[in-house]
Amino acid sequence: MCIVSHRYIPLTEKDKQEMLQTIGAKSIGELFGDVPSDILLNRDLNIAESEAETTLLRRLNRIASKNITKETHTSFLGAGVYDHYAPSVVDAMISRSEFYTAYTPYQPEISQGELQAIFEFQTLICELTDMDVANSSMYDGMTSFAEACILAFSQTKKNKIVVSKGLHYQALQVLHTYAKTRKEFEVVEIDLDGTVTDLKKLEAAVDDDTAAVAVQYPNFYGSIEDLEKIHSFIEDKKALFIVYANPLALGLLTPPGSFGADIVVGDTQPFGIPAQFGGPHCGYFATTKKLMRKVPGRLVGQTQDDEGNRGFVLTLQAREQHIRRDKATSNICSNQALNALASSIAMSALGKQGIYDIAVQNIEHANYAKQQFIKKGFEVLDGTSFNEFVVKFDKPIQQVNEELVKYNIIGGFDLGVVSDDFKNHMLIAVTELRTKDEIDTFVEKAGELND
């Protein structure tokens, strides 16, 4: 047998023989001599023979065609992942090799372009949220939320956090996971009054032991919480105010910082990040100058070199685990730099007016859909909303959604998964991409299936 090396394929037969000869072994099997023979797999793995690239691509495309996607179906599914317009320039820019990484650079002095891009992301987040400082991004909005709660515990030295059940249920799950590692932490969940937080119960729960109060804006059920009223409950208790906010909605709604929020977190998925099997996403974390030194994740700052030229650096690194290890503000130092860049490009391409216009379209399209459902005889739950709302059906939502797929429609989220109180309730998302005809068809088919 002729044994040859291959320029691009590692570990050829020739490579194996040379390695075995070097270490004095006769075969690869000899390397596993210490492993009992009865647990060794004494046969080849059941792996198919290689195929030509064209044949393989055809097979993979056939497999992929089984998926239901927003390219083949009209989507009214949201619940944290939305079908929004992404300018074409986003993919063109993030595909540049200089940017194509999920990490902040380890040698920042030679990565000025990447650092400036992250700095611009931080600046855009601060403008949207009306906050002083933002980090370079986090894994997703839910991670950012949990980290915000940890910061509140650390800052206030108190052990209770009061959270609305209007928060995304998975964000609450992440928080409870974090809390399990800290026995002294207490998480108090406040019930809803319809689709918004029960303010009387919230006010009663906030006391001198409260580290923070957290709500979502707009909340998981699509309704807009009264941040001004909620903040009034917190002021004299010396607790922090955490707001989990949809950044696109902030193009129109009054930002949380204007209501006295101490920490604003969320997910920038609505800006330039596609709905790709639920991820990856990009969490943002914004706060006040007072809390700057306790921010998790990495911070990029602007500075000057010895010659007076503008430059960018990773700043305040003493907070991070590679410096302080167990005393770090957070054990997260990785982030979503590539997705943060995508969101930055999308926001920059749209501009302030463009973001505002898209936010307005979301409200208008959602309100139109609401009215059509009401005209069709559905019960639509009350609440001022952005681009999501709740509709009650007479039949199980899973059954309705399975039938809607036959009409190339992806229905809304089954809220019965979250709570028995919302059995047969569908959370419907209507973004700027949904047309009048698509909405009308959805309502018509939903009505037929509900009869």
From Swiss-Prot:
Per the UniProt record, one Pfam family is GDC-P
Alphabetically list the UniProt keywords. Answer: Oxidoreductase
- Leader sequence range is none
**A GO biological process held by the record:** nucleoside metabolic process
User: Which Gene3D superfamilies does this chain map to?
Assistant: Aspartate Aminotransferase, domain 1, Type I PLP-dependent aspartate aminotransferase-like (Major domain)
EC number(s) recorded for this UniProt protein: 1.4.4.2
Catalytic reaction annotation: N(6)-[(R)-lipoyl]-L-lysyl-[glycine-cleavage complex H protein] + glycine + H(+) = N(6)-[(R)-S(8)-aminomethyldihydrolipoyl]-L-lysyl-[glycine-cleavage complex H protein] + CO2
The molecular function terms in GO held by this entry are: glycine dehydrogenase (decarboxylating) activity
Please give the superkingdom of this protein's source: Bacteria
Q: How does it assemble?
A: The glycine cleavage system is composed of four proteins: P, T, L and H. In this organism, the P 'protein' is a heterodimer of two subunits.
Its function, per the record, reads:
The glycine cleavage system catalyzes the degradation of glycine. The P protein binds the alpha-amino group of glycine through its pyridoxal phosphate cofactor; CO(2) is released and the remaining methylamine moiety is then transferred to the lipoamide cofactor of the H protein.
Give the UniProt family note.
Belongs to the GcvP family. N-terminal subunit subfamily.
- Identify this protein by name: Probable glycine dehydrogenase (decarboxylating) subunit 1
Record the organism.
Staphylococcus aureus (strain MRSA252)
**Organism placement in taxonomy:** Bacteria, Bacillati, Bacillota, Bacilli, Bacillales
Q: What's the encoding gene here?
A: gcvPA
